[in-house]
């Protein structure tokens, strides 16, 4: 979710661009599922990054040492950080500043804004962040820091520096303690050993919890940590002032004597209101029903706690799962749930972390662009990925808006927002960008112009490629078990890029089909075979409908001959003739039948020209022996002469 600072800057600008399409600054949705609840023992940590319709994202790999030890990183809004060592290599998905001008802060100094998500060479994965909504009283008691760390900086710093999830947590908490936060956030930091969730609602307060293997938690910008006992320091880390700030604000809920605090009720603005629809729909998704509503959900139904019946227990939530063992398919479908999937989705990602696997294959990062219902999640093995598909790296140009309906709807769509309405015109060459292609398809599919039949077609075709990705991830993992070094990196990078290209190509083909009625034809198939008399026909059929196109095939050079008939009988004095007729054009060809041998009982000499037995054979053999004898004699004589 995008920083509030950025939103206010964008609103103040009032430019006639896609900024008019901003739907909400608080629409990211995070979810975690512990390994005890999954079908393969993986843990899942995931989030959608939501901000605006039509706001390009790019994905890339930052190479080891991009930031040298001692160099200073300057973020969008004044936060700086001095690197303690050469930065680790890591994957990232950032806002599009390819033009050299940051779309978030408008500055030109080198930085990678809103990298949001990635995994580094040490196996540390970060999803940063979900913006939270603090109550006004706690912010007054502990204000945000103007130069504090923001969403725009978090993933960059943590992935560059941290060699473990715990080290990443400690680094972030130290920044909160010393520099402070520029905005409230919820951050996931994990590796193969543990996954942590960190919340801060004010400038210097925070709570971090180590998520357990038998729980589900989610946070659609509401906050997720409820009643916690701060003495459980193995699993709960908090700022020294966490209780004190809430007391100063007059919002503290908990027990000082027991060192407990209900973070949600003490700090979150939602504590005094109703849960949003994304929480309701997300809880119902795991229940496989629609039984819950905003009016029936209490904070205790979804917040994280380590207190039960007055005692410290393992961290848990009361979120119920009726899906059975949860698979990657279930996690992808979570981001297709209404409202969780929305036009503000910029990208969404799922980390599938398997603690028992080798470090190279223990983490799979599933990355999808744009609207959850119209995109495909592509699997990557981030520690082996050295580059990203080119379609993720297209950028540098922004979409524009116009009040006039374009004559050709291709590459455009209508929008309506609080600030106005009009038409979006995608940037030149947008077909080369994976984000823009999904943006075009999803906006058309959600419009009144798209028929129910076309919508069903889109979902059906995308589902086929998504299934291919599930199958391919398993295939890649098995293949990588027998690879190492550069071979493994080349294979993993190439296979993931090929899947992304296939999904991108399909998305563009679907868009052209439903918008411009262009057909994508399959292979040529011979539907009428050519003959010696007539040309044949080959047909192509559209992948998405029954439309066909044909072409002629040249006449065949050959004939279809029958079994033939003897038209002249062979005799002892003359050859015979067998005649064949083409069954298509009636052409004929003749074949000689050898003359018959003479009768065996006649007085004529034998007819065999070269008998294999008898006197002639013996004479030939005798001649050969004599020839060899003479040759041998000559050889011996010559040899003797040479010796002399």
Where does each model-flagged region fall?
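Bacterial N-terminal signal peptides that target proteins for export
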Residues: 2-11, 637
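Bacterial N-terminal signal peptides
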Residues: 11-22
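A contiguous strand-loop segment
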Residues: 28-150, 171-301
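Long, well-ordered mid-to-C-terminal structural blocks that present hydrophobic/aromatic surfaces
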Residues: 297, 301-401
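Charged low-complexity "KEKE/polyampholyte" interaction tracts
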Residues: 369-374, 382-516
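Extracellular modular ligand-binding repeats in secreted and cell-surface proteins
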Residues: 516-604
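Extracellular Ser/Thr-rich, low-complexity/disordered mucin-like segments
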Residues: 604-621
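C-terminal membrane-anchoring or membrane-association module
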Residues: 628-644
């Amino acid at each position: 979710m995008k920083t509030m600072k950025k939103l206010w800057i964008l609103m103040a600008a009032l430019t006639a661009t896609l900024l008019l399409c901003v739907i909400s600054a608080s629409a990211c949705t995070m979810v975690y599922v512990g390994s005890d609840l999954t079908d393969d023992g993986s843990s899942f940590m995931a989030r959608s990054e939501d901000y605006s319709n039509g706001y390009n994202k790019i994905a890339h790999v930052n190479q080891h040492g991009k930031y040298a030890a001692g160099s200073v990183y300057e973020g969008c809004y004044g936060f700086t950080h001095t690197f303690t060592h050469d930065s680790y290599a890591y994957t990232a998905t950032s806002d599009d500043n390819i033009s050299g001008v940051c779309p978030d802060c408008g500055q030109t100094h080198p930085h990678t804004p809103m990298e949001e998500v990635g995994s580094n060479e040490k196996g540390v994965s970060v999803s940063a962040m979900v913006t939270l909504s603090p109550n006004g009283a706690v912010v007054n008691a502990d204000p945000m820091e103007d130069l504090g760390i923001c969403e725009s900086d978090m993933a960059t710093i943590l992935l560059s520096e941290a060699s473990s999830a715990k080290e990443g947590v400690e680094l972030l908490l130290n920044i909160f303690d010393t520099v402070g936060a520029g905005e409230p956030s919820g951050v996931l930091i994990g590796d193969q050993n543990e996954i942590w969730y960190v919340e801060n609602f004010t400038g210097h307060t925070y709570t971090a919890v180590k998520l357990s293997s038998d729980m589900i938690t989610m946070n659609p910008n509401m906050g997720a940590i409820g009643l916690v006992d701060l003495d459980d320091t193995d699993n709960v880390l908090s700022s020294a002032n966490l209780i004190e700030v809430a007391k100063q604000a007059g919002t503290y809920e908990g027990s000082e004597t027991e060192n407990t605090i209900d973070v949600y009720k003490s700090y979150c603005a939602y504590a005094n209101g109703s849960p949003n629809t994304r929480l309701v729909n997300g809880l119902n998704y795991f229940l496989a029903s629609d039984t819950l509503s905003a009016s029936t959900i209490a904070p205790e139904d979804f917040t994280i706690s380590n207190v039960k019946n007055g005692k410290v227990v393992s961290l848990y939530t009361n979120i119920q799962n009726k899906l059975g063992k949860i698979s990657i398919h279930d996690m992808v479908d979570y981001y297709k749930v209404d409202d969780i999937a929305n036009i503000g989705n910029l990208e969404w990602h799922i980390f599938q972390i398997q603690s028992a696997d080798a470090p190279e294959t223990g983490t799979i990062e599933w990355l999808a662009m744009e609207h959850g219902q119209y995109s495909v999640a592509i699997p990557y093995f981030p520690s082996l990925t050295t580059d990203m598909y080119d379609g993720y790296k297209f950028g540098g140009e922004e979409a524009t808006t116009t009040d006039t309906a374009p004559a050709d709807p291709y590459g455009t769509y209508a929008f309506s927002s609080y600030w106005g309405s009009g038409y979006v015109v995608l940037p030149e060459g947008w077909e080369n960008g994976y984000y823009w292609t999904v943006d075009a398809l999803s906006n058309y599919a959600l419009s009144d112009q798209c028929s129910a039949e076309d919508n069903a077609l889109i979902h059906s075709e995308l589902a086929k490629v998504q299934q291919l990705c599930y199958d391919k991830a398993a295939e890649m993992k098995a293949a990588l078990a027998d690879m190492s070094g550069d071979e493994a990196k080349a294979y993993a990078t190439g296979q993931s890029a090929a899947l992304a290209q296939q999904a991108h190509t399909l998305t563009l083909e679907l868009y052209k089909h439903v918008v411009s009625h262009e057909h994508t034809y399959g292979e040529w198939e011979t539907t009428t075979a050519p003959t010696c008399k007539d040309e044949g026909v080959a047909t192509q059929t559209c992948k998405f409908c029954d439309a066909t196109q044909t072409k002629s095939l040249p006449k065949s050079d050959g004939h279809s001959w029958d079994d033939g008939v003897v038209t002249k009988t062979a005799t002892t004095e003359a050859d015979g003739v067998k005649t064949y007729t083409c069954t298509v054009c009636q052409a004929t060809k003749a074949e000689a039948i050898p003359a018959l041998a003479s009768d065996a009982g006649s007085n004529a000499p034998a007819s065999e020209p070269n008998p294999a037995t008898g006197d002639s054979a013996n004479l030939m053999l005798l001649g050969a022996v004599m020839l060899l004898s003479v040759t041998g004699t000559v050889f011996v004589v010559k040899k003797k002469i040479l010796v002399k």
